[in-house]
Amino acid sequence: MTDPLSRAHAAALDAADPLRNLRDAFVFPQHGDDDQTYFVGNSLGLQPRAARAMVDEVLDQWGALAVEGHFTGPTQWLTYHQLVGDALARVVGAQPGEVVAMNTLSVNLHLMMASFYRPTAERGAILIEAGAFPSDRHAVESQLRLHGLDPATHLIEVEADEPNGTVSMSAIAEAIAQHGPHLALVLWPGIQYRTGQAFDLAEIVRLARAQGAAVGLDLAHAVGNLPLTLHDDGVDFAVWCHYKYLNAGPGAVGGCFVHARHATSDLPRMAGWWGHEQQTRFRMDPQFVPSPGAEGWQLSNPPVLALAPLRASLALFDQAGMAALRAKSEQLTGHLEQMIHARVPQVLQIVTPVEPARRGCQLSLRVAGGRARGRALFEHLHAAGVLGDWREPDVIRIAPVPLYNRFSDLHTFVEQVEAWAAA
């Protein structure tokens, strides 16, 4: 019987993988004569091979039609953003009218808070996790100040209460219950960027809405990583980026979800002409008539060249399906966890929760001996063509992405850790 932690077993798993051919749909950076062993899809996804042709299609249409490309040609720019809408909805578990690709994550977060953070004298607090991504914290604090409120009194932070710096569901529930009468908004991540912890979003939404608070999600590390059910969960809004697991390129256009119950609401918003209903947009009337659904929060015409790579990537998600991607992801990350425990337990400590339901593909790792040794291992891996990433103060993040990573890649990683430890 083959050793389940051997390279031979990994090769057999790769050969039996129903998604194995998707790897060929991506361009890999090179290390010498070989592909890099790339575990950084949680920071920047690889380039889909089809992206170049789709960008060229836009460039060719621009060259051939100039301004007329907005209304004629194979992919009219007037409605180009809608070419990704249905596929995006499938990835995040939404109805098509609930999603739009626009702006960037932090811009969209501000737009959503302008509509959904409506503080009153009694209810003005915003609840976040204490380890929130800095841009989210900056956005929240600035929104509080715009309303004349002090973050010291109106920003509620849920501290990590588990040994590895993760947050229990009971701590979240307790904080929502304790501050419920004063909460205007709960803003929570789908996955914590440093620890890799995934959260029970449906339960967080239920608890927050029961207290009368609006609920928003930052899905930067969850979209394309976990199956999501935003419509059924009832979240008010969600924002995310497309340059990580959605492979749309550096600085890619962001994504936004607004629940269907708000599709035709009179919520105040920061308005722009591309959010005006499409049928009358070019009449240039002074009165703003919003498009129904998430498209009504658009400001300017979409960046068509930036949307083209997203189209290429979403076609691969449709080909694979989120359920199949998640099944492979659980296998990959579980296999990596087993190998770390079996072969390098004296070197690496896994920060990320062990339960598959509480993590995505990423494992966050600490190196025994502290930060200096952690940096030394990180730099050794990089020099060997094994790319993870580093998050201060002391975490190496390794994210096996099911679209393009193999079980044999995990062995390359562990073998390099062993080589470094033995040196």
Swiss-Prot record:
GO terms for molecular function: kynureninase activity; pyridoxal phosphate binding. InterPro entries: Kynureninase, PyrdxlP-dep_Trfase, PyrdxlP-dep_Trfase_major, PyrdxlP-dep_Trfase_small. Its cofactor is pyridoxal 5'-phosphate. It is an enzyme of class 3 (hydrolase). The keyword Hydrolase applies. The modification N6-(pyridoxal phosphate)lysine is found at residue 244. Keywords: Hydrolase, Pyridine nucleotide biosynthesis, Pyridoxal phosphate. GO terms for biological process: anthranilate metabolic process; L-kynurenine catabolic process; L-tryptophan catabolic process to kynurenine; NAD biosynthetic process; quinolinate biosynthetic process. Pyridoxal 5'-phosphate binds at residues 105-106, 133-136, 218, 221, 243, 273, 301. Its EC number is 3.7.1.3. It catalyses: L-kynurenine + H2O = anthranilate + L-alanine + H(+); 3-hydroxy-L-kynurenine + H2O = 3-hydroxyanthranilate + L-alanine + H(+). GO terms for cellular component: cytoplasm. Belongs to the kynureninase family. Catalyzes the cleavage of L-kynurenine (L-Kyn) and L-3-hydroxykynurenine (L-3OHKyn) into anthranilic acid (AA) and 3-hydroxyanthranilic acid (3-OHAA), respectively. This is Kynureninase.
